[in-house]
Amino acid sequence: MSTARTENPVIMGLSSQNGQLRGPVKPTGGPGGGGTQTQQQMNQLKNTNTINNGTQQQAQSMTTTIKPGDDWKKTLKLPPKDLRIKTSDVTSTKGNEFEDYCLKRELLMGIFEMGWEKPSPIQEESIPIALSGRDILARAKNGTGKSGAYLIPLLERLDLKKDNIQAMVIVPTRELALQVSQICIQVSKHMGGAKVMATTGGTNLRGDIMRLDDTVHVVIATPGRILDLIKKGVAKVDHVQMIVLDEADKLLSQDFVQIMEDIILTLPKNRQILLYSATFPLSVQKFMNSHLQKPYEINLMEELTLKGVTQYYAYVTERQKVHCLNTLFSRLQINQSIIFCNSSQRVELLAKKISQLGYSCFYIHAKMRQEHRNRVFHDFRNGLCRNLVCTDLFTRGIDIQAVNVVINFDFPKLAETYLHRIGGSGRFGHLGLAINLITYDDRFNLKSIEEQLGTEIKPIPSNIDKSLYVAEYHSEPVEDEKP
């Protein structure tokens, strides 16, 4: 049997004991900040060119000729309707439609073909303000449609007649950069020439330099790489009209804050800044006071945790953890799961154990080569494996809607880390399960995190109600079509 140390992602045979049955993961698409891609979307990606670090860029601009008066919606290639139940995190809206924002028809076509039917609360609040050119400071939960909240106005404001960089999206991790760029490319595919580029550390700098010789309208980047390209005079940002900081609390932490300050200083003074984050520490407030001009503040965080995520803990010794995990695998109906460890070494050891137990397993951590990380992320996102073991590298904004179970094999020390981890399930208002394996040394952290987040983590019951985390128990019936 192959072990988890294999350089290529290895798909072990799926065990038929439990809910982890043989066969591919069910595709589940949905509106919001992205989702697992439908077959139609995957076919679209197959017909595109791959540039630099694996990001997809349209080989030819797609143009759709719609005559005035045509019912253009009939020409759309819509993904299957998402019939899963959704929580008020995404359904508690004002009832607006995307058409209410006077968006370009070609942009609307991309929005609807992503499966985004109506704006989520964060999109309702953000889109009209961002279109007006005003700075935004938005606090919203992960998994509620933040990517769409800034990408839609960003794309609407592009002038495709110009050949310079007009917008930048800065994100803290390479995986998030690739995810956001793929969403951006898909949404803009009917716009006739919107050029999107992702650039991250760990990839070929020469490839990025060559790509920037051609027209690029939108750059989605990690902080260090884009600053390097700006300083080299390769990325010319003197025409940038909008910059987005996604996961702003991480971007403005001690690791990145000076880089972000340097990036902002290179931009025009009249640029628009959009900040999105689930938490707003003092560093974000300080940055806002220095660089944002009368920002419009959005706060959709009455409570910090996603409403669709049920949280449990199980008291175990360190030696019992693998046995407990095996028991969970045998009893839970897992579509896809993410399992967190606190170190890269423990990730590899646990992935090997899971493979030896006979379960499908990938692993990912920051010490792996970027090429390998990209491949694992892509394959897991597309449902080639049920279980992913990882470090906190994989917590920020990663949107894989097929994930319905998150397991903290190692309990985190910080409430912020816990919040981002469990946000891996219950994406875009769907249901999910978060299970924490708690040792004697973790008991004080458990209590502290409960108090800081104002949430309740319950003892795990002997049987977990599948209606709490299995979408099929709540899927809306498909109405019979009338003859």
Swiss-Prot record:
**Region of interest called Disordered, as start-end residue ranges on this chain:** 1-40
Enzyme Commission (EC) number:
3.6.4.13
Q: What is the organism field in this record?
A: Pongo abelii (Sumatran orangutan)
Q: Where in the cell is it found?
A: Cytoplasm, P-body; Cytoplasm; Nucleus; Cytoplasm, Cytoplasmic ribonucleoprotein granule
- Which positions in this protein are listed as binding ATP? 140-147
Using the UniProt record, give the first listed, main subcellular location: cytoplasm
Q: What is this protein called?
A: Probable ATP-dependent RNA helicase DDX6
Lineage per the UniProt record: Eukaryota, Metazoa, Chordata, Craniata, Vertebrata
User: A single GO CC term, please?
Assistant: P-body
Q: Which reaction does it catalyse?
A: ATP + H2O = ADP + phosphate + H(+)
Source species, domain of life: Eukaryota
